[in-house]
UniProtKB/Swiss-Prot annotation:
ATP binds at residues 8-15. This is Nucleotide-binding protein Glov_2163. It comes from Trichlorobacter lovleyi (strain ATCC BAA-1151 / DSM 17278 / SZ) (Geobacter lovleyi). It holds the Pfam family RapZ-like_N. One of its GO terms (molecular function) is GTP binding. PANTHER family: RNASE ADAPTER PROTEIN RAPZ. Displays ATPase and GTPase activities.
Length: 285
């Protein structure tokens, strides 16, 4: 049976994700104690009901969250279940704003401030985050974008044979993407921003792309980076990962990182992988 565990930070969009999966035909249950995971799955199997899978929501509200959660995952996988763990996150600033908009207390402790609650929650969920199949950063998403991302993740990534790589360009000025598995800094390359004829254009413009890719250091970097990815991706597959997010950053996320992201993605596609490209800050830089 396919099992999707939804977890992550309060205010990061877990409820929206659950509703999206219910619409896709998954049976969803919220705040189930970890010790009951396997028994619940067995009951669903015996019921004879037809579902695409089961969604189990667990977060800081669970009293037994810190004891046995990773072991529970291993147990479910050991008896043949396809288990995915989706961890939803967002920047502290975004989470604080969302709590202010809803006027809710933070569930970590009703007596603490929201920022303190977020800090406590991050500590308690650290092991879950480390064992996630996929981390989804919802900081920049609206409700519709979040639903789309969840559906794409569920429909697109189902095992190492369909390993998916998302290559994201970003600007360090706006922060590192929270869901990045690998982060590469390409600020060592010459910056088209200081070439007046190139400054107005992004790294998708042929002239800017040519400027970046024809630098001697660029060729060497791409060769070394691609060799590293050829080593890492099979290792991720062996560990049961089905999704890798590579974040490539420059100062503003408009020129160098965009060109390098597209060049990296083109090389990865030659390996037969599913590759997605996104340029987070291309309109900001």
């Amino acid at each position: 049976m396919r099992i999707v565990v939804i977890t992550g930070m309060s205010g990061s969009g877990k409820s929206t994700a659950v509703r999206a999966l219910e619409d896709e035909g998954f049976y969803c249950i919220d705040n189930l104690p970890v010790r009951l995971f396997r028994q619940f799955v067995e009951l669903i199997e015996k019921s004879g009901e037809s579902f695409k899978g089961v969604v189990l929501v667990t977060d800081i509200r669970g009293r037994d969250l810190s004891t046995g959660i990773v072991e529970s995952f291993r147990e479910l996988r050991s008896v043949g279940h396809e288990l995915e763990v989706l961890f939803f996150d967002a920047s502290d600033e975004v989470l604080i704003r969302r709590f202010a908009e809803t006027r809710r207390r933070h569930p970590a402790d009703e007596h603490c401030t929201v920022p303190e609650g977020i800090r406590i929650e991050r500590e308690r969920l650290a092991a879950l985050r480390q064992n996630a199949t996929l981390i989804i950063d919802t900081s920049e998403f609206n409700v519709h974008q979040l639903k789309e991302q969840v559906i794409r993740a569920i429909k697109g990534e189902q095992g190492s044979s369909n390993f998916t790589v998302e290559v994201v360009s970003f600007g360090f000025r706006y922060g590192v993407p929270l869901d990045a598995s690998l982060v590469m800094d390409v600020r060592f390359l010459p910056n088209p921003h200081f070439v007046p004829a190139l400054r107005p254009y992004s790294g998708q413009e042929p002239a800017v792309r040519q400027f970046v890719l024809e630098q001697p250091d660029t060729t060497a970097f791409l060769d070394h980076f691609f060799n590293l990815l050829q080593f890492l991706i099979p290792a991720y597959c062996r560990e049961g990962k089905s999704y890798l997010t590579i974040a490539i950053g420059c100062t503003g996320g408009r020129h160098r990182s965009v060109a390098i992201t597209e060049a990296t993605a083109a090389r990865l596609e030659t390996l037969g992988l599913k590759v997605r490209i996104s340029h987070r800050d291309i309109e900001k830089g």
